[in-house]
Regions:
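N-terminal FAD-binding dinucleotide-binding subdomain shared by FAD-dependent oxidases/monooxygenases
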Residues: 2-16, 21, 26, 30-162, ...
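A glycine-biased structural micro-motif
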Residues: 11-13, 167, 184
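Active-site glycine-rich loop that binds ribose-phosphate moieties when present
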Residues: 172-175
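Glycine-rich NAD(P)-binding loop of Rossmann-like domains
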Residues: 179-187
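Ligand/cofactor pocket segment of small-molecule handling proteins
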Residues: 200
Length: 537
């Protein structure tokens, strides 16, 4: 629906309301409408489909998941015949794919764009969710599905006196549709996470001066950008369902099987050869998880990986002082970063690296930024400072469950869910890739989760039952997830994985770390035991 068509929502009665029109939201809409035949409408504050791929259109934006698994499998024709041009698709190509899926299945007619949901409250008397839009209109639905995104709630701290700056401040996840021309300009990029390194490598050769404002250096490996491999296309065409099941039957669903050999089990020369092969192949997740089994759990194994990356860094960066600034003593236990030619960027005469932990960003001036007491004159400041990941978008909606239970209050000490899909005391409420979902790539896992709760809703519909979650089952799931993170180096390395990147956010587990194959086994056992842990009645 267009903005004009989405007006007049007040009093709308639905079977299902879906918040979000990204990867998970589109498939949830398809399942509720086409599989179950329910009266369903979706709501998204964007003007089009895509979710995070609608908003994140900054220079260099692309997936760092193999395009082979960044796709739906429910439409076998598109799964086999969509012509990805690159091994790692650019944002524009991902968005084109999602629009093609939505158009083929006529999903947009059931989506209210430019519509923000501010509040969702369960009414026990009518057994309905009451949604309130930013315009004050109310919509009622028997089921509520939130597909609001893992990395969609951007975090961009404001430095003092920003209003004085005569240049332009751009927030990467809210990049203007009319792409600003950065050619020849003096640009600062604040942040060197996944977004930052993509922007830096993309614009370094185009801008006049590039100032990289780095707080925390991170280990970076090549991505391996190139044409979509024909052998991958052939494998999908041969048996698409077998390929999908092979991808899901893994730890992280990134299109490879995780390593089974300890990094400490090989002689140094053999270990180095394996790292070199992974380096030449590219992909951060592959380097971290496919090479060896214990990089994320053993400090000693982790050091073998960081020693190798450090040797590559030192060989690539000509200035030893800059190489030292790019080196971290932290474990290789954040979201793995990958970008082709990242370290080599710092050999360019127009690129300057600043350590803003030692010399903090103080404030804006008319001409730029004061960093460590020195003014840097700038035309553009790009904020690439990350996301309030996992929980951020859920908490932007005031969500009220049974008995007036407030989700934000319940999650004060950290999120609590069952299987990453439901919350005790919030009836007929489902999440796509909510907190305590598996630590994986997303599209195929979104599909799996939506299929799971579609079956649960179908079972409930037969008797018009309400679906809720037992507190004990939720507590047990949260404990399993907390124990799983505690056994990894992710637990003791500050990052968005454990919420440490957001001031005041609880530092806690937000993931099921047992891998997708184990997750499916756990959740299928629950289903086969009459949906043990769910309350259907």
């Amino acid at each position: 629906m267009t903005e004009a068509q989405s007006k007049g929502l007040n009093g709308l009665e639905l079977d299902v309301a879906i918040i979000g029109a990204g990867v998970g939201g589109l498939y949830a809409l398809y399942c509720m409408r086409e599989k179950l035949g329910l009266n369903v409408q979706s709501f998204d504050m964007a003007s089009g489909v895509g979710g995070t791929w609608f908003w994140n259109r900054y220079p260099g934006c692309r997936v760092d998941t193999e395009s082979t698994v960044y796709t739906y499998s429910f439409d076998l024709d598109m799964f086999q015949n969509w012509k990805w041009s690159e091994r790692y698709a650019r944002q524009s190509e991902v968005l084109a794919y999602m629009n093609a899926v939505a158009d083929k299945h006529d999903l947009k007619r059931s989506i209210n764009f430019n519509t923000r949901i501010n509040r969702a409250a369960w009414d026990d008397a009518s057994q309905r969710w009451v949604l309130t839009t930013a315009n004050g209109e109310t919509v009622r639905a028997r089921y509520l599905i939130e597909a609001v995104g893992l990395l969609s709630s951007s975090y961009a701290p404001k430095f003092p006196d920003q209003d004085k700056f005569k240049g332009q401040v751009l927030v990467a996840p809210k990049w203007p549709e009319e792409n600003p021309d950065l050619s020849g300009k003096r640009v600062a990029v604040v942040g060197t996470g996944s977004t930052g390194i993509q922007i830096i490598t993309e614009i370094a050769s185009k801008v006049g001066q590039l100032h990289v404002l780095q707080r925390t250096p991170q280990w970076v490996v090549p991505l391996g950008i190139g044409p979509f491999p024909q052998e991958a296309r052939d494998r999908i065409n041969l048996d698409p369902i077998a390929f999908r099941d092979w991808a899901l039957d893994s730890g992280t669903v990134f299109g490879f099987k995780e390593g089974t050999t300890s990094a400490l089990a090989l002689p140094p020369e053999d270990r180095a050869a394996r790292y070199e092969k992974a380096w030449q192949k590219g992909n951060g997740f592959s380097f971290m998880l496919e090479t060896f089994s214990d990089i994320t759990v053993s400090p000693e194994a982790n050091k073998t990986a960081t020693d190798f990356i450090k040797s590559k860094l030192d060989a690539a960066v000509m200035d030893p002082k800059v190489a030292a600034m790019l080196t971290t003593t932290d474990y290789y236990a954040r979201r793995p970063l990958a970008a082709d030619g990242y370290y080599e960027v710092y050999n360019r005469p127009n690129v300057t690296l600043h350590d803003v932990k030692a010399n903090p960003i103080e404030r804006y001036t008319e001409k730029g930024l004061i960093v460590g007491g020195q003014e840097i004159e700038l035309d553009v400041v790009i904020m690439a400072t990350g996301f309030d990941a996992v929980t951020g978008n859920y908490l932007k909606i005031q969500t009220i469950g049974r008995g007036g239970a407030n989700l934000a209050e319940q999650w004060t000490g950290g999120p609590r869910t069952f299987g990453g899909m439901t919350i005790a005391g919030f009836p007929n409420f489902f999440m796509v890739f909510g907190p305590f979902s598996p630590f994986t790539s997303q599209p195929l896992v979104h599909e799996w989760q939506v299929n799971y709760f579609t079956d649960l809703i179908e079972a409930a519909e037969k008797t018009r039952s309400i679906v809720d979650t037992e507190v004990s089952a939720q507590d047990n799931w949260v404990q399993i997830c907390q124990d799983g993170l505690a056994g990894t180096l992710f637990q003791i390395t500050d990052s968005w994985i454990n919420g440490a990147n957001i001031p005041g956010k609880p530092r806690t587990s937000m993931w099921y770390m047992g891998g997708m194959a184990a997750y499916m086994t756990e959740m299928n056992a629950i289903r086969d035991d009459n949906y043990r842990g769910f309350k259907v009645g």
